[in-house]
């Protein structure tokens, strides 16, 4: 055999077996990665079924016959469970998972200082609007990225706030703020002014649901302090003492209808939860909040609250104030998916935010009939008469 031909064949055989070994190793790594990912998912489903309200983002990679864990979680037990679930693989495990909150040298509690603060999905102004938080509401700081803070709202929702949206409070300042009497804004929109007259320059705007501290009364005006220390005057009829409002506010079908109808024509805003703009669940959340009941943020979260009401094609079992949920019905290929919510009024009428806050009807005979709503109806939940998650600040 020609010597060169022999060497060439030998090189090809070596190359073939080398590639085969690499292929087998890659397959083994892929299988191993799949096992690791399955363990991570199992732990996630146990400790953080909803990452909109729970911090848990853990990944793993395989390097040099070892497992490297990285990411973050708010559950110490989840870290332990992840490591224990991977021990059977008999590989060295490097734990680089961060435990949150781990905030050093800052005050971890903040109070919203502007009428409506925009919470975003990522730390940049161009990021998707996730939700909004109103003036006077507390937030918990979980982590920081430059001028952005990853925070948790009072309904547990997570997202990013810019640093000028809120004021961080020391324990002493927080105690002082909490001890002050609060004024709860019931008007849809109002201006805090420098002096007690309507021609005075503005200090800030406020919207329904905003909370400020009350300092004194001046005839038809009330002297208030904002969370960041700014002061000014509000018309006395723009709100009520918060403790009195909370004590005397009794949510019922009529009050739900009244507040809901007062928002007719308000613009739709994805991620909005204020009178400046609201999405479907932001609308229902706002209506119930102004009646003293705190709902979860998103439609599919709200669908987990209250008592389910069985309905027929005439919707005769529904009562005013019930929440109606819409979306994709379950089929053999896909699970049920709730994407819209509205409030039932009467005679088939549903008030909801879609483009703007409006009333549609579920009956084909009605002038304001919505075929889309009827075809996508999934379920109804009754929040009243039970008072769930009473609004706290």
What role is predicted for each listed range?
Residues 12-17, 26-137, 163-169, 173, ...:
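N-terminal targeting leaders
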Residues 68, 132-162, 204-236:
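SH3/SH3-like beta-barrel superfamily modules
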Residues 84-102, 153-184, 197, 225-259:
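Boundary regions of SH3-family modules and the immediately adjacent low-complexity/disordered segments
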Residues 112-135, 185-214, 268:
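Beta-loop motif signature
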Residues 168-171, 175, 190, 198-200, ...:
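Aromatic- and glycine-rich peptidoglycan recognition patches
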Residues 260, 272-291:
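Active-site nucleophilic cysteine motif
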Residues 295-359, 365:
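...with weaker cross-activation on analogous glycine-rich loops/strands in unrelated enzymes
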């Amino acid at each position: 055999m020609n010597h060169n031909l022999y060497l060439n064949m030998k090189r090809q055989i070596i190359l073939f077996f080398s590639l085969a070994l690499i292929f087998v190793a890659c397959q083994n790594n892929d299988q191993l990665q799949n096992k690791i990912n399955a363990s991570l998912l199992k732990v996630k489903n146990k400790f953080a079924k909803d990452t909109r309200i729970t911090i848990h983002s853990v990944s793993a990679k395989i390097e040099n016959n070892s497992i490297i864990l990285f990411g973050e979680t708010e559950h110490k037990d989840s870290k332990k469970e992840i490591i224990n679930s991977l021990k059977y693989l008999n590989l060295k495990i490097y734990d680089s998972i961060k435990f949150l909150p781990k905030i050093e040298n800052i005050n971890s509690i903040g109070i919203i200082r502007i009428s409506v603060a925009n919470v975003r999905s990522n730390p940049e102004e161009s990021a998707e609007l996730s939700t909004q938080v109103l003036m006077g509401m507390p937030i918990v700081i979980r982590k920081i990225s430059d001028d952005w803070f990853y925070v948790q709202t009072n309904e547990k929702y997570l997202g990013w706030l810019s640093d000028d949206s809120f004021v961080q409070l020391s324990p002493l300042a927080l105690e002082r703020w909490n001890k002050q009497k609060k004024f709860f804004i019931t008007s849809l929109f109002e201006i805090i002014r420098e002096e007690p007259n309507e021609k005075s320059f503005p200090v800030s705007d406020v919207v329904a649901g905003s909370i400020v501290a009350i300092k004194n009364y001046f005839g038809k005006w009330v002297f208030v302090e904002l969370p960041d220390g700014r002061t000014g005057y509000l018309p006395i009829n723009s709100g009520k003492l918060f403790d009195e409002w909370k004590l005397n506010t009794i949510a019922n079908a009529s009050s739900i209808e009244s507040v809901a109808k007062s928002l007719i024509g308000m613009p739709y805003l994805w991620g909005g939860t204020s009178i400046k703009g609201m999405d479907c669940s932001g609308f229902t959340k706002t209506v119930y909040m102004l009646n003293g009941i705190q709902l979860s943020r998103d439609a599919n979260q709200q669908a987990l609250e209250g008592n389910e009401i069985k309905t027929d094609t005439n919707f005769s079992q529904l009562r005013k104030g019930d929440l109606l949920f819409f979306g994709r019905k379950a089929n053999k290929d896909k699970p049920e998916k709730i994407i819209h919510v509205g409030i039932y009024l009467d005679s088939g009428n549903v008030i909801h935010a879609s483009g703007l806050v409006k009333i549609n009807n579920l009956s084909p005979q009605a002038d304001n009939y919505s075929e889309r709503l009827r075809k996508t109806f999934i379920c109804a939940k009754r929040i009243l008469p039970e008072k769930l998650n009473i609004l706290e600040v």
